[in-house]
Amino acid sequence: MLSNTILSRSFYKRDTLCVAKDLLGKVLKFADYYGVINEVEAYIGQDDPACHAARGYTPRTAAMFGAAGFSYVYLIYGMYHCLNIVTEREGFPAAVLIRGIDLYKPTVLSLNGPGKLCKKLNITKNNNKIDLTQSHGFCVYNTTARPEYMATPRIGIKVGTDKLWRFKSM
């Protein structure tokens, strides 16, 4: 059941794997769109070779080093945007990639894949570094849902594939 409560900074300022699992079943709101998060991946710090911050701080990865609860949106392959939410303490680069949602408003549609999700919702780099803990049309709402999930290797990467840091609702 959807609440009117937007997830707080303290929700995101925790261990990234815990945040990733706990985001499953929560409702992502962007503009007029609402969708239940059903698939995520965790990227954790400079020791994670698949994490964008593995090579350190750059202008592109600046958001990952910032405060928890902010968006980190980037472009891959020069054509697909990806939405992440920054986690853990400021200065430690970690984030959760939102890989899929079940859109239910204004239309019902399953969006599997971060590129499809961002394209349909029109999330772009203009939405980078947005505080998702504030009510401004781009946030994540709490729910009472605690879906069962499976943990699998992350996909679409060439390094760090040994980690079971992709979580998908069952």
Curated annotation (Swiss-Prot):
EC number: 3.2.2.-
Class of the enzyme per the UniProt entry, highest EC level: hydrolase
TM region(s), chain numbering: none
Coiled-coil intervals, chain numbering: none
GO biological process: base-excision repair
Keyword Hydrolase in record: yes
UniProt GO molecular function: alkylbase DNA N-glycosylase activity; DNA binding
Protein origin, superkingdom: Bacteria
Keywords: DNA damage, DNA repair, Hydrolase, Plasmid
Family: Belongs to the DNA glycosylase MPG family.
HAMAP family from the UniProt entry: 3MGH
Protein name: Putative 3-methyladenine DNA glycosylase
